[in-house]
Amino acid sequence: MDEKIYAHSLKLIPQIGILRLEKLYGAFGSFKKIWKATHSKIMKKTQDKELADVLKQREKIDPEKEFEKLKKQGIGITTIKDSSFPALLKEISHPPLSLYYLGEIENVFKKFEHFVTIVGTRKATPYGRETAKNLARDLSTNKVVVVSGLALGIDGEAHRGALEGKT
């Protein structure tokens, strides 16, 4: 459970994108270890002062409280080391380190045949946002699982649309 709590909390730090998270995870091998690491330990393992400085924002986040917010919305998270993490995703060149889902993740991969990923810019136009949301909603209404990175912009709108469609 700890890994999930810290995986989610790290994603709440605005300057921590996938590349920085991959760098940290490669250095520490655990979300909890990243979260608990001191500034000097981060510097030693990554040789990246800017990244170590960005992680000072951890002080502003209460991991347990943030994880409870997810649970109250029925949202779960699985990490790359969990048995519930999709095996095929582990085989791609840069797999996501964690996935968010609504409902029971085991059911998603047994119940559905079709999956689509919607990704795009964080600085989307209003038209782009609306299109991503509508497309994801329509797909999920038609029993297509929409996978999104949950980043700001297109990814986030696709995620919202998929939730509206209630796959």
Q: Each predicted region: which residue ranges?
A:
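Phosphate/pyrophosphate-binding betaalpha-module
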Residues: 136, 145-167
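Generic beta-strand structural signal
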Residues: 97, 114-116, 142, 150, ...
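Short, positively charged patches
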Residues: 1-137
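Short active-site oxyanion
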Residues: 73-76, 142-146
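Short, well-ordered coil/turn elements that cap or connect secondary structure elements
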Residues: 72, 94, 141, 162-165
